[in-house]
Swiss-Prot record:
This is Chorismate synthase. It comes from Deinococcus radiodurans (strain ATCC 13939 / DSM 20539 / JCM 16871 / CCUG 27074 / LMG 4051 / NBRC 15346 / NCIMB 9279 / VKM B-1422 / R1). Its EC number is 4.2.3.5. One of its GO terms (biological process) is aromatic amino acid family biosynthetic process. This reaction introduces a second double bond into the aromatic ring system. The gene is aroC. NADP(+) binds at R39, R45.
Amino acid sequence: MRYLTAGESHGPQLTAIIEGLPAQLPLGKADIDPWLRKRQGGYGRGRRMVIETDEAELLSGVRAGRTTGAPVTLAIQNKDHRNWTEIMSPEPGGEPRKKALTDARPGHADLTGGIKYRHKDLRDVLERASARETAARVAVGSIALKLLSELGIEGANYVFNLAGIETRQAFSWDALDAIEDSDLRTPDADAAAQMRERIDQAKKDGDTLGGILEVRFRGLPVGLGSFVHYDRKLDGKIAQACLSVQAMKGVEIGRAFENAVKPGSGVHDAIHYREGTYARDTNGAGGLEAGMTNGEELIVRVAMKPIATLMKPLPTVNVVTHEASDAARERSDTTAVPAAGVILQCVIGWVLAEAITEKFGGDTLPELQERLAAARRYAAEY
């Protein structure tokens, strides 16, 4: 499977084309739009989330509620585009451009992207570099999550840490409703109250906040990925997918950093055979060994830096005059940490769905289900 996205933050729409989805997968807007709404939620979001009410439009590859095997095309309209039609017009003219951005923002793609693509109006960089693009990736990832659910695989995400405030309540699959009901995607009500106070103060200060997200999947078969070549290792693919999301700066699988300072005898997960299957009493590896799923729960933590657009901007340089200036102000969030967990679950879900279709093949969902069931039986009997 593969996909491409296109579109700018204030362009008419975001578009995605997905190739390789098996036919006969039940699919409709009801499988996609709830994930788009989750992405827009969370305490600390900005005014853009009030303007946009994201919905996916399925344009090809789905008929009568099922995939056909043809490429799936979907679009998400940018409602804010009506305020930017002249500024974002593809037609020549209008120089000097309206709302040209020439004061590069530290921490953004602005300066480096401007040099790379020879733009002096840095809006030509930020429009595509914007995290608005993640709406398309959430739509794509939600389809992957739908495929995984049809194969008996379930995912979850929550905020482990926001601005140094940790969720102290250990993750439980029984707490998913509490996570979904929380505007900070944490089951820990006390931690959530502290997080809100920290966000409110940061907003008053014109500052932004980062955090750490945790994503989990259960029900994965043994053997997704490979140890044979570097580019087939699943942990490498997961890390790449996570770090490709705007503002993500670090990835941990299992208890990686905690394990780094321990002796091996206190790190690795002992293997047992009971009740007709292989099992581990601990999961320090986070469900991945040597680039392959081992049948245990997949546990991934991702560090998100604070958003780089500040209401009290940092010093910078104007790329036209080369004079010192303050960084440009753009509408932004105080924090998007809760939404980031949703995005990360979707991008990791895509990697897992891709790995499953690569390993088991098949043109249709029933074929994939049959082959996966056979692989599960073999692993249990091995």
